[in-house]
């Protein structure tokens, strides 16, 4: 699932990266030559081996073409809202890599040069924040905002962001009118009857049909392997012989696929908050695993709220805080707050807390105000802003890309009985997110284009050590995913932040992690063994 952001309040997604912004459709809750084939030599992906060979040849052609063309850098358009001296441009790629001379699309990229001397420069560091559906164009702003965490790395690298295919300024796709997408209140994601389930199934089917009607030409090509090929073309357009890459959340899966397809094109790769790359997890089982992890992190937040009852007055035990949540949820189900905030919108707002420690105090404060009688604070935080047409279009686009990539990347159960069985079972013990997540992904059950077989992620010849960073109690990308990728990428190193659960670790202040990320990016060096770091500072009320 993705983080929901119908509400217009700042979240950590723009900086730490994540499964990034969106809203559930019904539950709201958000250079070197290209390698010839996958590292295992078999067609584990788009059909069969011949298809992979055609796409690999197409990627090589596109990369060579981009290397010759380069990028025409210029000041960014005013509506991109990127401060100078950040520069913007486009890279042209095939829509279908099996047809490299066929229809082309343009990918938006931006950059800021390294802050150190020419002799200190090591190349470009390309970033993906996650999603699928997240824009990386804010990455160079870490330099203009003088982020202390990234100051050392910025001396050595140009910071480069991009909008992946289908996102933002890169041939954007859409599945529904944005203003319709954000209307509230949406149906309660927890079904109270079989009729409720039928209604949600109808919405999911109509959403999938809308994706095909509005963006059908792009849908078959909205896959992680194609985005990885795009990434290699961007590398070539930048004039980089090898890729330096930072990927967070879904960006870790993009990195894993890139490292499998182009192992000898990787120079440095940091993956933070890792999607489990196992083929039997992508993507149906991965979302079920999230439901369990979100419940655990939700309880962590409730424990923290209870420990700070003097500040929030929501109860001094987890059970009391949960009781307040259930009362709020029931009240919103009976009569939506302000006419627009029902249970779906509440989940959209409150899920920030399981995602990020930085949201713990703000979420608790607004919850506390509601219990004390200030309903408006919660309405302002959780309700959509229909006047924000640009933001709503971005949210709808992000959700469309999320759905398109996850539904096309892999095969999903087409039988409703499977979904009903699995989510009914999970909801009993993990009620916070289960049904909301299910409805968000249900369009994949009736997806109108061919669903692929995920790549077998593994080490290929030439892949250097990859640095993996993960918090132990991450809800969006459970810890087991980092362990799985660590096992698949030989020579990789795993840094674990114990007793912590924020999603997106490299952007937090934790010297045990920050110093090792700097060392790796600046020298390629890693510890002789995996490292466990103490958690970053606990939030304060």
UniProtKB/Swiss-Prot annotation:
GO terms for biological process: proteolysis. Residues 1-36 form the signal peptide. InterPro entries: AB_hydrolase_fold, Pept_S33_TAP-like_C, Serine_prot/Carboxylest_S33. Keywords: Aminopeptidase, Hydrolase, Protease, Secreted, Signal. The keyword Signal applies. Its main location: secreted. Residues 37-39 form a propeptide. It is an enzyme of class 3 (hydrolase). Its EC number is 3.4.14.-. The keyword Acetylation does not apply. It comes from the Bacteria. One of its GO terms (cellular component) is extracellular region. One of its GO terms (molecular function) is tripeptide aminopeptidase activity. Transmembrane segments: none annotated. Residues 123-501 form the AB hydrolase-1 domain. It is found in: Secreted. The active site is at residues 249, 474, 503. Cleaves tripeptides from the N-termini of proteins. Does not cleave mono- or dipeptides, or N-terminally blocked peptides. Belongs to the peptidase S33 family. This is Tripeptidyl aminopeptidase. It comes from Streptomyces coelicolor (strain ATCC BAA-471 / A3(2) / M145). The lineage of its organism: Bacteria, Bacillati, Actinomycetota, Actinomycetes, Kitasatosporales. The gene is tap.
């Amino acid at each position: 699932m993705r983080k929901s952001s119908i509400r217009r309040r700042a979240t950590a997604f723009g900086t730490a990266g994540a499964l990034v912004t969106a809203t559930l459709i019904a539950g709201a809750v958000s250079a070197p030559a290209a390698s010839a084939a996958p590292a295992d030599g078999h067609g584990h992906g788009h059909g069969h081996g011949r298809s992979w060979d055609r796409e690999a040849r197409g990627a090589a052609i596109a990369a060579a073409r981009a290397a010759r063309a380069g990028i025409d850098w210029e000041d960014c358009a005013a509506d991109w809202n990127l401060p100078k001296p950040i520069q913007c441009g486009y890279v042209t790629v095939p829509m279908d890599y099996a047809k490299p001379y066929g229809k082309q699309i343009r990918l938006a990229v931006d950059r800021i040069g390294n802050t150190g001397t020419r002799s200190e420069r090591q190349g470009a560091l390309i970033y993906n924040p996650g999603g699928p559906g997240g824009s990386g164009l804010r990455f160079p702003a870490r330099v203009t905002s003088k982020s202390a965490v990234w100051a050392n790395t910025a001396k050595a690298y140009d910071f480069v962001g991009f909008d992946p295919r289908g996102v933002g300024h890169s041939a954007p796709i859409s599945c529904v009118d944005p203003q319709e997408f954000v209307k509230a209140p949406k149906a309660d994601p927890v079904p109270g009857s079989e009729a409720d389930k039928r209604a949600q199934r109808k919405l999911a089917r109509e959403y999938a049909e809308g994706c095909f009607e509005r963006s059908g030409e792009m849908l078959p090509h909205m896959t992680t392997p194609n985005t990885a090929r795009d990434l290699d073309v961007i590398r070539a357009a930048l004039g980089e012989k090898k890729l330096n890459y930072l990927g967070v959340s879904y960006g870790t899966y993009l990195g894993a696929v890139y490292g499998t397809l182009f192992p000898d094109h990787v120079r440095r790769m940091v993956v933070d908050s890792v999607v489990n790359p196992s083929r039997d997890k992508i993507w149906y089982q991965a979302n079920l695993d999230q439901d369990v992890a979100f419940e655990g992190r939700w309880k962590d937040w409730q424990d923290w709220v209870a420990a700070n009852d003097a500040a929030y007055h929501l109860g001094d035990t987890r059970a009391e805080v949960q009781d307040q949540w259930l009362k709020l949820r029931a009240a919103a189900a009976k009569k939506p707050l302000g006419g627009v905030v029902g249970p779906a919108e509440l989940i959209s707002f409150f899920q920030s807390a399981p995602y990020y420690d930085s949201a713990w105090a703000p979420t608790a404060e607004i919850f506390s105000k509601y219990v004390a009688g200030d309903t408006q604070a919660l309405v302002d935080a959780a309700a959509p802003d229909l006047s924000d047409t640009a933001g709503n279009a971005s949210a709808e686009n992000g959700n469309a890309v999320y759905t398109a990539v996850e539904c096309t990347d892999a095969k999903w159960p087409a039988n409703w009985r499977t979904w009903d069985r699995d989510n009914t079972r999970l909801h009993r013990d993990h009620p916070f997110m289960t049904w909301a997540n299910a409805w968000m992904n249900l369009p994949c059950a009736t997806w109108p284009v061919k669903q692929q077989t995920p790549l077998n992620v593994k080490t290929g010849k030439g892949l250097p050590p990859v640095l993996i960073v993960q918090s132990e109690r991450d809800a969006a990308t459970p810890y087991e995913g980092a362990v799985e990728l660590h096992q698949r990428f030989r020579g990789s190193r795993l840094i674990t932040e114990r007793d912590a659960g924020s999603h997106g670790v490299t952007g937090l202040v934790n010297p045990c992690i920050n110093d090792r990320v700097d060392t790796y990016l600046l020298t390629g060096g890693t510890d002789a063994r995996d490292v466990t770091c103490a958690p970053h500072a606990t939030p304060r009320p």
